[in-house]
A protein has these predicted regions:
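Bacterial Sec-dependent N-terminal signal peptides
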Residues: 1-22
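Residues that line or immediately flank small-molecule/substrate-binding pockets and catalytic motifs
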Residues: 8, 12, 162-163, 244
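Generic, well-ordered alpha-helical scaffold segments in large soluble proteins
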Residues: 11, 158, 228-231
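Zymogen propeptides/activation segments of proteases
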Residues: 21-85, 89, 93-97, 341-343, ...
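Short, solvent-exposed secondary-structure boundary motifs
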Residues: 30-38, 114-119, 352-358
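Juxtacatalytic substrate-recognition/specificity segment
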Residues: 49-174, 182, 192-193
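Acidic/His/Gly-enriched intrinsically disordered linker/tail segments
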Residues: 128-129, 145-150, 165-231, 235, ...
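Beta/coil-rich, acidic/histidine-enriched accessory regions frequently appended to metallopeptidases
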Residues: 248-416
Length: 416
């Protein structure tokens, strides 16, 4: 995400829209323009409004967004009505259901802004104008799908950054967690997200060993956030943002909010990964059935097996045991060698019921009259203390700090 916060003085201009309850904030970038003239780059003559939004499109489109001039031989049309309606739906959901905006927000008085650029740039941005009101910027090539997935993601950023704009939270000063959260917010309004953007899930299955908050996974993995939402309610994620402090990361804030020790946090993260295997969440159960139990960490070795990639901090391996033991057995036993780990089993019965072992269990007993298909061993890296995942800088971008790995090996035995 490109955090667009354009600093301005505390003095601002505003335009009161006719018959609109909320006002329109005039960003510093637009104040030198005649916004009433259709010859200006941005003009109220090329805009539409809802109760909560103003959508503006650049001069190059002309007045008809369904039939604008081509740019470098490329069509520039988009469905303005669908864009308006979908973003308004997202707005209501993020405000009312997820509580990313609370009473007293500047968004109570001012409309968020959707700016459609006459450009072939494939990048969309969500943030705020002048650190004052939520806004997003997009080109037509990102708003061609009827579901407007890109808009849900970017409006998520607008709401995230409205929190510091309202001075009700620092939200850690920025981190990859913003991208994870926008993917989660998109997933909430589109339960079919895993299908629409399946490449993210396929990539994540190859990278589950990566540390939580690792930048390689920030677009792939809203699943821990979903787990936290299951545990504490959907509105808890926005509250996490409000409670965030500069100098913390989301894990530190989360532990402080819920008064958790490092051991408790590791146990809870492991439980979340057990649930992830079969997508046992309160959200999108039907839509995730085709992706349930598709994790399969590669292993190597002889009698003692080890994963191809050891887990990093809070990263995990989901090792499918179907070809390693006889699933008709009633009991399974684990021998594991390694330090600072969380491990245990997840069995999925043939009638799609999940059976979880305790944390650090070395035995798994199949419930009576049940048969398994499949059985998983879950192993997670569990650091004794939490520390920041280093963000890339100009100095370390090509050679980032190497993260801790948690090596282990294991054997599985099945008994009748």
């Amino acid at each position: 995400m490109k955090r667009i916060i354009l600093l301005a003085s505390c003095v601002f201009a505003s335009y009161t829209a006719l018959h609109a309850q909320k006002k329109i904030y005039i960003p510093e970038d637009l104040r030198k323009m005649d916004l009433q003239a259709d010859t200006s780059q941005w003009s109220f003559k090329r805009s539409i409004e809802t109760d909560d939004l103003i959508l503006m499109w650049e001069r190059g489109f002309g007045s008809d967004t369904s039939n604008p001039p081509m740019l470098e031989g490329k069509p520039m049309s988009f469905n303005l009505t669908n864009l308006r309606d979908r973003v308004q739906e997202f707005y209501h959901f993020f405000r009312d259901t997820l509580a990313f905006s609370l009473p007293g927000s500047k968004a109570d008085k001012y409309k968020m802004m959707v700016m459609v650029n006459y450009s072939l740039d494939g990048t969309a941005y969500g943030g705020t104008y002048d650190n004052f009101i939520g806004a997003l910027w997009v080109a037509p090539n990102r708003i061609q799908d009827a579901k407007m997935n890109c808009m849900a993601h970017e409006l998520g950023h607008s709401f995230q950054l409205q929190i510091p704009a309202d001075s009700v939270g620092d939200a850690w000063g920025g981190s990859g967690f913003f991208e994870m959260t926008s993917q989660w917010m998109l997933w909430q309004v589109n339960p079919g997200w895993l299908t629409d953007e399946n490449y993210h899930f396929e990539a994540f299955k190859q990278l589950t060993h990566k540390a939580y908050l690792h930048l390689d996974n920030i677009y792939h993995s809203p699943f821990v956030i979903q787990w936290w939402s299951d545990l504490h309610g959907r509105k808890s994620i926005a509250e996490l943002y409000r409670q965030g402090r500069i100098g913390e990361d989301p894990v530190m804030t989360y532990k402080r909010m819920y008064n958790m020790s490092q051991k408790q946090f590791c146990d809870e993260m492991f439980r979340g990964y057990q649930h992830l295997v079969n997508f046992d969440f309160n959200h999108a159960r039907k839509e995730t059935r085709q992706y349930a139990c598709t994790f399969d960490t590669e292993t190597e070795g002889g009698k003692w097996l080890r994963p191809k990639n050891y887990p990093e901090e809070y990263g995990f391996n989901a090792i499918k045991l179907d070809d390693k033991v006889n699933l008709n057995a009633r009991k399974f036993r684990l021998n594991i060698q390694g330090d600072n780990l969380r491990y245990g089993f997840v069995g999925i019965t043939t009638d799609d019921q999940s059976v979880y072992s305790d944390v650090n269990a070395t035995e798994f007993v199949v419930p009576k009259s049940k048969r398994l298909s499949p059985l998983y061993l879950i192993v997670m890296g569990a650091p004794l203390q939490h520390y920041h995942i280093p963000m890339p800088t100009d100095e370390n971008y090509k050679n980032p700090q190497k993260l801790l790995e948690f090596p282990y090996s294991f054997r599985i035995f099945a008994t009748r």
